[in-house]
Amino acid sequence: MPDTMVTTDVIKSAVQLACRAPSLHNSQPWRWIAEDHTVALFLDKDRVLYATDHSGREALLGCGAVLDHFRVAMAAAGTTANVERFPNPNDPLHLASIDFSPADFVTEGHRLRADAILLRRTDRLPFAEPPDWDLVESQLRTTVTADTVRIDVIADDMRPELAAASKLTESLRLYDSSYHAELFWWTGAFETSEGIPHSSLVSAAESDRVTFGRDFPVVANTDRRPEFGHDRSKVLVLSTYDNERASLLRCGEMLSAVLLDATMAGLATCTLTHITELHASRDLVAALIGQPATPQALVRVGLAPEMEEPPPATPRRPIDEVFHVRAKDHR
């Protein structure tokens, strides 16, 4: 039973903020159902991008990210979210059940972390090297608290090998019609509440200066941040010790935590998952980190120009499409 009564409006507001979480091609593969002052998170299987994400692994990462974002939003509202993961063995889509207890105190850190949800962007442009990296790296390592997830940093002298892994992914998919059709659909020019708008994509010239990004359709002829030259970001790798669904969900939660920590430190980020979508390129990344773990997601972390406008926020689905209240059964 929940220890405190939280109104549906508070839960709904927290879910709306949480839905700023990143997901593959902004597919937002989640559903929330509130009932009796609790809320449940479900995977929306109709929003899994199977041509890209064959096993639904990345959908689980996205759901983990939205779950952590929700906990952050509730903490800023003065409430601790108590999460039970995979509570129903008969329903694999039921990822978490959450009840609530009052927090002792809402700190400035809680508020700033919730603010970081709105400030965070997926920035696909080149970055400058992040300052004070040793301190930042130490902080990011402490952020990854799940026993099933580890964090590593790609050494600078191994960046060519990482670029080769990225190139291998794209070459293996050169004739994959289903993959490219899915990619083009989710980067369409039409105004919508999902997918990646053209304003969030990069030109060919900009893409050439980030040697391990996903190859998206080229929609512009711009060359932003020419003063940065080639990307000098640091690259993090989040890995799991197995491929169990629980580990993937936790990895998504840790991805959220890393992104928010980096944002709070004033740094720009870009999540990369294409390099882990195929076994051949994923194995190359595993060799680079030299650990008995399976890479699930990479994150570029760096510095964007201080006076530059941040990339526009990508759209999100209306809250009433992802959040529902289950009526009480009075029988």
UniProtKB/Swiss-Prot annotation:
Its GO CC terms are:
cytosol; peptidoglycan-based cell wall; plasma membrane
> Which region is the signal sequence?
none
Write out the residues that bind FMN.
28-32, 316
Look up the EC number in the record and give it: 1.-.-.-
**EC top class, as a word:** oxidoreductase
Q: Which residues cross the membrane?
A: none
Q: What is this protein called?
A: Putative NAD(P)H nitroreductase acg
- Taxonomic lineage from the root: Bacteria, Bacillati, Actinomycetota, Actinomycetes, Mycobacteriales
